[in-house]
Amino acid sequence: MLVFPALKKGEICLEYLIEYGMFLAKAGTIVVAVIIVLSVIAVTGQKNKKPGKKGSIKATRLNDHIEEMRDTLREKVLDKDYLKLVYKKERKESKAERKEKKQQLKKGQAEEVDSEETRKKRFYVLNFKGNIGAEAISSLREEITAVLSIADPRDEVLVRLESPGGMVNAYGLASSQLLRIKNEKIPLTICVDKVAASGGYMMACLADKLVAAPFALIGSIGVIVQLPNFSKVLKKYDVDYEMISAGEFKRTLTTFGEITQKGRDKVQEDVETIHGIFKAWVKDHRPSVEIDKIATGEVWVGTQAKERYMVDEIRTSDECINDACDNAEVYEVEYVFKKSIQDRLGRVLESTADKLFSKWFERSTDDKYQ
């Protein structure tokens, strides 16, 4: 165990410094040894690894989660005698519901008439948290494929969307994934609790019902191209920059090359073209908006967006899901990618470093204010 002696102001404890140095050396040796061993295991594992599934679908019944929280709170809050009556009533209702369902199946029809025909509506919840490259597409496409393999127009899909936008092609693909749901005539609700801007709104406007929280950021229907240019810096220091290309507009804006007015005009033309396509996309899917008034690149909060017909309702995703649990079977669907040993090792090391830094920072702060 490392003992930290109490030092008087200005006192230098050589013994403490030596002990602390030895501690760091031992700790560093152990960490390096562990990393080497795990790296060898990882490399060996990768060599012997057989191709298989990239990941798997996980489905969580949200009704159970809400019922569990409700029951826990009931037991703490309600009188015991009253609670017994509540449970008795619920058991009776559940029994009556099962009996009615059984009778409906008997009335009828052949054994092939499965409970599917008399089942409750199913409500599938997906999550999309986008970055500049919309990397969450990798999971979204798998989740949608899984849902479409079982859902039908009686069901509904709710997507909790959070994205400030990003690259046009990436968000175009993400939007196309949502179109798969609409093409199957399955109702699509999109909930925005925080932000759906630019490419995020490109996705959101596809919803049959678009719901936003009061202060969610909505809009930014615009296109931007920006990059720094160091051509003047290179000239100042007599550094040549060579670029060979074929095609008049193969390179219009570059980081190190000199930008010509012709190149600048071409980029502006491309930006205007993409903006026009973006506007047409929004107008096609939300015909009630005044597209020229909202496609200015501006952002509005949820309540302002509703006034401009950019969203349909002001609510949170929690409200939508809780309401759905009253009348439907609600499932949160998530595609989980398998993590390699390298990924797991990286996360462990990152977590360890964060904890060590946090502890050091806390101790430093405590010492400062003692």
Which residues fall in each region the model found?
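N-terminal organellar transit peptides
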Residues: 4-189, 195-196, 209-213, 224-370
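DNA breakage-rejoining catalytic core of tyrosine-based enzymes
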Residues: 200
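Alpha-helix C-terminal capping segments
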Residues: 203-209
